[in-house]
């Protein structure tokens, strides 16, 4: 079972990352030295715990936004994503390519005269490759 981190460790790690994000790294020893410089931490053990959790959070931040940490960089990224309007729609309806079966289905529904629909040659599906032992009892 893992160790439980106290509220003090979590809170101080988040504060340090918010203020000194540009200086923090994914390396524990570097983060420990940075903490020594920027914060007054009463004990070596507490400093190491905060540095360890800060390193853990930095690794999580690399993967995506972390709850409880508001970084200006992440906020700008979020705003950019919200305001982004593509030049060209991802859903192009100028030319829709369908197989023979779908075209026949549309014809049966009386919708074969829709503009922009073209037929595409379908490829034969390959039989799936079987890996591992054969099913059933193994014979020698």
From Swiss-Prot:
Domain of life: Eukaryota
One GO cellular component, as annotated: cytosolic small ribosomal subunit
Pfam family, one: Ribosomal_S17e
Keyword Ribonucleoprotein tagged: yes
Any single GO BP term: translation
MF term (GO), any: structural constituent of ribosome
Cited InterPro entries: Ribosomal_eS17, Ribosomal_eS17_CS, Ribosomal_eS17_sf
Keyword Amino-acid biosynthesis appears in the UniProt entry: no
Key words, A-Z: Ribonucleoprotein, Ribosomal protein
Family, per entry: Belongs to the eukaryotic ribosomal protein eS17 family.
Protein's name according to its UniProt entry: Small ribosomal subunit protein eS17x
Organism from which the protein derives: Arabidopsis thaliana (Mouse-ear cress)
